[in-house]
């Protein structure tokens, strides 16, 4: 049966060619953020929102909930900014939370550049993708969680261990906090 109907082309979000992934030279130069998904024991899906500083690969925060819309992302970023300061740029993929006008307006008001990777090219956000793999293998796949509170508690405990005790080979076999100490003045 040939109906000769026109095939409607998909709308594509075209972005200019991104810059190659550079190694930041100081803290708060570029942050990366991404989402991960998993399930509780009862089968309900939850999401984790991960934010790292690309300079020392420090995990700045892991937010866990069943739904993490753009206002929740902004609230999590504001909490991180309170103690860490503003980044110059944040690298992220093209998820609906990231391309929302709410997040774009927030970033513009704070003077933060949102760097979007090309669709289907997660290697352009390699720092946080590698971090996600570590999150997945070090604790997310190791336990079965009954509640969101259990997941958030485990995430907070693991984040401290990751930043303070776990050596990172990408930054010379030292922990993210040791890398941070090499550039931050020590209070006397």
Task: Please state what every model-predicted region is.
Residues 1-188:
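Charged DNA-binding/catalytic regions of mobile-element recombinases
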